Amino acid sequence: MKETKKLGRFEKLARDVLISTSKMLKDAKIELFDGIHGRVLEVGAGIGVNVYFFNRPEVDHWVAVEPDRKLVDECHKMVADMGDRVSVFQGYLHELEEPPESFDYVVFTTLLCSVPDPDKIVKEAHRFLKPGGKLCVIEHIGDSFGLRAGFQMLAKYPWKLATGCNCRNNPVPALSQPGFWQDVDDRVELKTAPLRTKRFSPMLELLKPFVMTTLTKK
């Protein structure tokens, strides 16, 4: 029987941020994931919370990629009711042994802020998508002015040390690689994601604003 490791302090912080962020992004995820079907690849799946925003009967198979062993264990618990329609892979996207052009959808949520080479991740996602397949993205970006922008600048390095996340993230260059997407000539256009916020949270304020888009492979 596989040993399940307990979450450490930083893993608990990461899990709590994932859950809180997912609640805040509920409306955005319902909108973005509407229509997801077939074979779905999620990169940086964390504990698997996004599955609950899919129309699960329409998902033939969900492949989750997550490098953190402890989060993988949590993910297995989260999606146990989907049975053999789920594969949770502990590792990195470039290590995934799946055929090129074998997925109808690829999902990124708050991923590009925490990887060392966003361009490479987007290229790999593009490789796994079928022609006409869709990349669904929600990311947070660095604010451009005001108190939050200053706070993000001050917190950038300690926050990254604690969580692995760049709170001054800019996903546009990685997503805008030429020749990848239908109806994109130069730069990908990102839409502001709707947020649900019931009470002030300094941690979540640090991550705002959030943006979203769906890109279709040529």
Where are these regions (language model features)?
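Short alpha-helix
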Residues: 163-181
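Class I SAM-dependent methyltransferase SAM/SAH-binding core
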Residues: 41-42, 47-95
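Core SAM-dependent methyltransferase catalytic element
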Residues: 178-179, 187-218
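A short SAM/SAH-binding and catalytic strip from SAM-dependent methyltransferases
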Residues: 105-117
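A short glycine-rich, Lys/Arg-flanked "PGG" loop and its adjoining helix->strand segment in the class I
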Residues: 119-131
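A short acidic, Gly/Pro-enriched loop at the edge of an enzyme's catalytic core
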Residues: 94-106
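Conserved alpha-helix/loop element of class I SAM-dependent methyltransferases that forms part
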Residues: 19-39, 49-53
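Conserved beta-strand signature within the Rossmann-like core of class I S-adenosyl-L-methionine
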Residues: 133-140
